[in-house]
Amino acid sequence: MGISTVTDQNWHIVRYSAEEKERWDRFVRRSKNGTFLMQRDYMDYHADRFQDCSLMIFCNRKLTALLPGNLSGNCFYSHQGLTYGGMLLSPSITLQQVESVFHAALDYLQKECSVQSIVYRAIPHIYHRYPAEEDLYVLTRLGATLVARSISSVIPLDDRLPFRTLRRRQLKKALASSLT
């Protein structure tokens, strides 16, 4: 296992290491808000560009949350090699546990990694398996400052968008010009 710290009698944090890959990936697949971006094969594609500082957070020896991240100087990013990279949560986690997870992670990052600031990019809720915005609530309660907001859009595959007349005209022009 990686560097480990006991934050209190219930919470235990382990810094990710390669021997934890299978456990990490299994948790991502069953978490309420993980996506393929958080699978280690995807994250490790840029391993040479970022100093990984991903955290595995345990409650009573049970993996409860993951925090993909990297260090740059004294700043923790969730994660610069990913489009987004917020806290991945167990489907059974409670709001009180999420608060404890954040407090434990902040304590760990300050004490073990000398982190002075955090840049947190939440996982857009449209990608969640189960609604999960506890992280945003807790960050607000902790006094976090919003510095940027990104937009995420989806197209429901089972509800096709109408084909507009203007698009049809442009398509005919493209075909007539041998542009395909």
Description of each model-found segment:
Residues 1-21, 132-180:
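Acyltransferase donor/substrate-recognition loop-hinge adjacent to the catalytic core
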Residues 16, 70, 90, 123, ...:
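Structured loops at beta-to-helix junctions and adjacent beta-edge loops in soluble globular domains
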Residues 12, 26-29, 41-109:
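Conserved donor-binding loop and adjoining core beta-sheet/short helix segment
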Residues 113-124:
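Conserved GNAT acetyl-CoA-binding A-motif
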Residues 24, 120, 174:
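A residue-level signal for conserved active-site and pocket-lining positions in enzyme catalytic cores
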Residues 34-41:
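Short Pro/Gly-enriched beta-strand edge/turn motifs at strand-loop
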Residues 126-130:
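Acidic-and-aromatic substrate-binding clefts and catalytic sites of carbohydrate-active enzymes
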Residues 109, 115, 143-144:
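Conserved alpha/beta cores of soluble small-molecule-handling proteins
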